[in-house]
Amino acid sequence: MKKIQVVVKDPVGIHARPASIIAGEANKFKSELKLVSPSGVEGNIKSIINLMSLGIKQNDHITIKAEGTDEEEALNAIKAVLEKHQVI
């Protein structure tokens, strides 16, 4: 299992648009991908509803975890998408 920690910079946090983009990217990979909220609640990154239900806000420190055969590639791709869309 691999994980990274990032800080959310988007003024409105993870809302519908970034959740859709993140989930779309995550679904390209076989690995299990989880986002862990500051309170420790885990959500499936491949689910838009799971991502939005975590209530991630600006300046929240979140952890992204990946476990599987393509975990490193998946983490790098998710981080790149978050950076490209200025979520982190």
From Swiss-Prot:
CDD domains, A to Z:
PTS-HPr_like
Where in the numbering of this chain does the HPr domain appear? 1-88
Q: Which GO terms describe its biological process?
A: phosphoenolpyruvate-dependent sugar phosphotransferase system
Q: Which GO terms describe its cellular component?
A: cytoplasm
**Native species:** Mycoplasma pneumoniae (strain ATCC 29342 / M129 / Subtype 1)
Q: What is its main location?
A: cytoplasm
What InterPro entries is this protein classified in?
HPr, HPr-like, HPr-like_sf, PTS_HPr_His_P_site, PTS_HPr_Ser_P_site
Full protein name: Phosphocarrier protein HPr
Location of this chain's protein in the cell:
Cytoplasm
Activity modulation comment? Phosphorylation on Ser-47 inhibits the phosphoryl transfer from enzyme I to HPr.
Tell me where in this chain the PTM Phosphoserine is found: S47
Q: What does this protein do?
A: General (non sugar-specific) component of the phosphoenolpyruvate-dependent sugar phosphotransferase system (sugar PTS). This major carbohydrate active-transport system catalyzes the phosphorylation of incoming sugar substrates concomitantly with their translocation across the cell membrane. The phosphoryl group from phosphoenolpyruvate (PEP) is transferred to the phosphoryl carrier protein HPr by enzyme I. Phospho-HPr then transfers it to the PTS EIIA domain. P-Ser-HPr interacts with the catabolite control protein A (CcpA), forming a complex that binds to DNA at the catabolite response elements cre, operator sites preceding a large number of catabolite-regulated genes. Thus, P-Ser-HPr is a corepressor in carbon catabolite repression (CCR), a mechanism that allows bacteria to coordinate and optimize the utilization of available carbon sources. P-Ser-HPr also plays a role in inducer exclusion, in which it probably interacts with several non-PTS permeases and inhibits their transport activity.
| Similarity comment text for this entry | Belongs to the HPr family.
